[in-house]
Design a protein with these regions (language model features):
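Helicase motor core with emphasis on the C-terminal RecA-like subdomain
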Residues: 1-170, 175-211, 216-223, 231
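Extended Lys/Arg-rich polyanion-binding regions
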Residues: 117-120, 126-140, 161-173, 182, ...
Length: 352
């Protein structure tokens, strides 16, 4: 990427996680800061930016504008930049790992080459899916994209959709064809004061429109704020799952390539207090996952193994973190988290 910036190439590098975006951004800027770019005496570190969920709306808009105008050459992004934004001439797209679906892969690669010839690069790791793609390239290049899969029986997902649907049009129990568990959900919303029963017609009376009240990424509605202790600025907001995995005490939280250490995670007020710091490592949480089998629906024999499909209850606790050195990925050690962060949301799901 430093070479692409030096040669004036415009590019997007897609990463699979927010943390990876920040790590790659910092490491690229570190390399650029050691390059003497005599032709214009510019600070090349300003020619690249990160782009991911968790940046403020005005931050993302500014990055989009700078990329379109050519003020920056490259963006390191999550799939937040995959759709919906026209960013003009891109010479190169780099996918750091297979994004999980062929549909997402083609959306990312298709960011380049819209007006001229361009290059798409897929970097494969050592995981099984990566090795399969390396040997069977036709899987990506010659077959269609996947079907979208949604479990409409998930009560948490149904609840969010029933709330949004009720705000648009009154519901009845006959809507069970669309929402199989509506008979269980409506009493909950009546008790919460969000629906009114008009002779079997249920009308939304909630104070706010519910569609903007839940995330497309997950089902948690508990929002945490990340506050810079030095100036009181709110860096970002995140849901509880992210907070437990990213801003536990002593974690290194990164925003636009800048490092912050978490001083305190207040679970009552849902505030993570951070302060700027410069260290040679980033942190990765270590989790303890507990899976309880509730009910088995189907069993299939594979040689000496039995695969079972059924209901499971998943609980996850963040118990420690490891410190990984920048650039060489050396593990600098583990530290226990003082109070294990057990997610209060116990996720009921289907599993094999």
């Amino acid at each position: 990427m430093p070479d692409m910036i030096q040669n004036g190439r415009r590019f997007i590098t897609f990463c699979k996680s927010r943390r990876e975006v920040e790590v790659v951004l910092k490491e690229t800027r570190d390399k650029l800061s050691n390059i003497e770019y005599i032709p214009s005496l510019l600070d090349l570190t300003d020619k690249i930016a990160g782009y991911r969920g968790g940046y403020k709306k005005e931050e993302r808009k500014d990055i989009e504008k700078r990329l379109v105008k050519g003020d920056i050459n490259g963006v390191i992004a999550t799939n937040a930049l995959e759709l919906g934004i026209d960013i003009g001439d891109i010479d190169i797209v780099i996918c750091s790992g297979f994004p999980g679906t062929k549909a997402s892969f083609w959306q990312q690669i298709g960011r380049a080459g819209r007006r001229k010839e361009a290059v798409g690069i897929l970097i494969l790791d050592v995981g099984p899916i990566y090795q399969y793609i390396a040997v069977n390239s036709e899987f990506l290049l010659k077959t269609g994209i996947e079907n979208a899969v949604l479990d409409k029986n998930n009560l948490f997902i149904q609840l969010a959709h029933v709330r949004a649907a009720a705000a648009e049009l009154p519901l009845t129990l006959d809507d069970a064809e669309l929402f199989p568990d509506i008979a269980e959900i409506i009493p909950v919303l009546l008790k919460a004061g969000e629906l009114k029963n008009d002779g079997g017609i249920f009308t939304w009376i909630g104070k706010e429109h519910p569609a903007g009240d839940f995330s497309l990424r997950n089902i948690s509605r508990d929002i945490y704020k990340v506050i810079n202790k030095i100036n009181g600025e709110m860096l970002t907001e995140m849901d509880e799952y992210q907070a437990f995995h990213e801003v536990y005490e002593k974690a290194i939280y990164m925003h636009d390539g800048v490092q912050y250490m978490v001083e305190k995670l207040d679970l009552v007020n849902r505030i993570a207090t951070v302060f700027p710091i410069e260290v040679n490592y980033f942190t990765v949480p270590f989790t303890d996952t507990m899976v309880n089998i509730i009910k088995e629906f189907k069993n299939t024999e594979f040689a000496r193994t039995t695969a079972t499909f059924g209901d499971v209850l998943i609980k996850e606790a963040v118990v420690a973190y490891k410190m990984i050195q920048f650039h060489n990925r050396q593990n600098l050690g583990f530290e226990s988290i003082r109070d294990n962060l057990l997610l209060p949301l116990k996720q009921k799901d289907y599993g094999i």
